[in-house]
């Protein structure tokens, strides 16, 4: 007897909810309450009624994405980018910029206000242009077997699929100018399958470009790249498994209005928003009320983004960074700018630094700009220095609140705070907060 196999029909397990949106959180998600549970809903605005697909359903909260609108907000905007909600770069192009900023301010102020009874001076948001602000982009490359061509673009949200792009609404004009030219260049490559990705950085002395490849680059392709770099006046870098080599152009740098130049390598971390970076630094200098009598410590200093401007205004400055190569670059930047009242040291700031020789110095003011994980491991030793002012630059409100609570327990109070709108149309919340002794 022959048994015939009949496959079971697949069932549709997609779960949906209908929600009335009450508020907007700082990440650009609509907030709803259903049977006492809080739901965070993508692509939804206050006063909208939406049908949503559930993405995550936990005991105390849920995450969903809007699929159909029964009621739409009159404030909803048409996104500028055709790839919005597919590309993972922007989350808030449908939200008016003032609404985005208000949600971020409200989130920070509510969290910090719970930490102390004394009033906090919440300052106006530090903001700039909402579009064309990114000076760095990373573009994935994929050989399309159907067209036999290279596709260049951004990864689709939550997948490895590629969205080909010819422009990006939040990238600087110098980067957008190059995108169609790069597409045309890649079509000429003899060995397109071995290409990985491209990074573009709009430095103040031109655009730096890095091409990642996985196998030996054919000489004909290398020549194509060199001619392109010469024609477009690029600083060209190639990256293989052996490392990175610069094959054309000068070293990239960015420059502050006071004349300080910071040279960097193509893969080094730099703030992507050039204008807001300088405004953030100027705010830090202003809030610290610097004088020629001050001795300042800069923790998580990188290559000297804050340290060099600090040193020009004080008696002495010391920068601490965990990555030795960045310590070297910071020292080189100080030497290039002829700033001599400055020292840099390597230290793991995920551990106590009380035994470090530089920690025996006297610092009356401290600045720290930690990663998203915050600075909890450094705070005990930091507080032992008994500085009169501590300025904390944060890229994560959760770790800022955690660390602020530690500082308050050590006898500091929050004097003032402000949101920095470093990344418009995204859920990132950058802030600057000043702590003083009680």
UniProtKB/Swiss-Prot annotation:
Keyword S-adenosyl-L-methionine in annotation: yes
Q: Which reaction does it catalyse?
A: uridine(1939) in 23S rRNA + S-adenosyl-L-methionine = 5-methyluridine(1939) in 23S rRNA + S-adenosyl-L-homocysteine + H(+)
Where do the annotations place S-adenosyl-L-methionine binding?
271, 300, 305, 321, 348, 369
- The TRAM domain sits at 8-68
Q: In which residues is [4Fe-4S] cluster bound? A: 81, 87, 90, 168
Q: Which UniProt keywords apply?
A: 4Fe-4S, Iron, Iron-sulfur, Metal-binding, Methyltransferase, rRNA processing, S-adenosyl-L-methionine, Transferase
EC number per UniProt: 2.1.1.190
Cross-referenced Gene3D superfamilies: 2.40.50.1070, Nucleic acid-binding proteins (2.40.50.140), Vaccinia Virus protein VP39 (3.40.50.150)
Its top-level enzyme class, in one word, is transferase
User: A Gene Ontology molecular-function term?
Assistant: rRNA (uridine-C5-)-methyltransferase activity
Q: State the active site.
A: 395
Q: Which example biological process does GO assign this protein? A: rRNA base methylation
CDD domains according to UniProt = AdoMet_MTases (cd02440)
Q: Which family does it belong to?
A: Belongs to the class I-like SAM-binding methyltransferase superfamily. RNA M5U methyltransferase family. RlmD subfamily.
Q: What does this protein do?
A: Catalyzes the formation of 5-methyl-uridine at position 1939 (m5U1939) in 23S rRNA.
List the protein's name. 23S rRNA (uracil(1939)-C(5))-methyltransferase RlmD
What species was this sequence derived from? Answer: Haemophilus influenzae (strain 86-028NP)
Task: State the gene name recorded for this protein.
Answer: rlmD
